[in-house]
Amino acid sequence: MRVHFGGHLVYYQAERQPWAEIHIPGPLLLDQVIDQLRIPRGEIAISAVNGEAVDARTYLVTDSDEVQFFPPTNGG
């Protein structure tokens, strides 16, 4: 699975890169992947799989998916 960490979310992975390859044994809820990556839920505003926004609590991902996480935006 290819995972994109948007914005400051790169700091939640050791390599501090915007993209990472991870492998999962079979279909998992996206929430379980977030747990494995140790990203606090409040830090993710949007989760997308293969370019479509999804509900991480109910969406099953596979090893062939491309996942993107985006933090909340700031500004005015």
Describe these PLM feature segments.
Residues M1-G75:
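Ubiquitin-like/PB1-type beta-grasp interaction modules and other compact soluble beta-rich domains
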